[in-house]
Design a protein with these regions (language model features):
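Substrate-binding/active-site clefts of carbohydrate-active enzymes
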Residues: 1-152
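Active-site-proximal helices and loops of the catalytic beta/alpha 8
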Residues: 31, 44-47, 59-60, 64-73, ...
Length: 207
């Protein structure tokens, strides 16, 4: 029953733990549905307070199309006619398509999340993210929200995460998030999806 889904989930986790199984769930950090809306109280949501006319700002949740972006928009033109495009603004797709006219080969039903660096700027932008060389650099908002999400599921007894499209997320985030998760649960398990021929590399990874 939909209204009992959290209770059912908790019961499943308990049964797994009782027989010595460690439950893992899917963690999708790169993108969300274009219709995504969080329903957890007391937490910031992706995109809250964003300037819909600015392509990139470190504290924004998404990347927004501008008047200089390719294509004839607004509105956003989606290729299949099944989803209504955003009418007064547009957001970059989950596969980094910066256009008002994403194709059917783009992930047009998804939206790219912003990890505090402009993915169009390359390596120089990655150097602005917080890491051991710049510990005083402000932790981007999306990082903080993702840490809250991981913490929530760990609090329910989840012991690990299968990380979707892990190579599209900055290495600096993974180091930060995994370290924080291991403070909460030292043996927490992270498994990265190996999606293409460059599965060893993430933004900022020297491999």
């Amino acid at each position: 029953m939909p209204e009992k889904r959290m209770e059912e989930f908790k019961a499943l986790v308990k049964r797994c733990r009782t027989v010595g199984l460690v439950p893992l769930i899917d963690f999708i950090p790169n993108h969300v549905s274009r219709a995504y809306l969080a329903d957890w109280d007391g937490h910031d949501d992706f995109g809250e307070g964003d300037d819909h006319h600015t392509f990139f700002s470190p504290e924004q949740g998404y990347f927004y199309l501008t008047s200089n972006s390719p294509g004839d928009g607004p509105p956003l033109h989606l290729p299949d006619g099944l989803f209504e495009g955003e009418m007064t603004f547009g957001r970059v797709t989950g596969n980094n398509a910066v256009t008002w006219n994403p194709t059917r080969y783009d992930w047009y039903e998804t939206v790219k999340l912003n990890y505090g660096y402009n993915f169009l700027a390359g390596l120089p932008a990655l150097r602005l993210l917080p890491d051991w060389t710049s510990p005083k650099q402000r932790v981007p908002k999306t990082w903080r929200i993702m840490d809250d999400i991981l913490s929530f599921w760990q609090g329910l007894g989840i012991g690990g995460f299968r990380c979707d499209m892990a190579h599209m997320i900055p290495m600096a985030f993974w180091k930060w998030a995994i370290s924080r998760s291991r403070v909460r649960l030292p043996d927490v398990f992270f498994m990265a999806e190996a999606y293409n021929d460059h599965m060893k590399t993430t933004p900022g990874d020297p491999c």
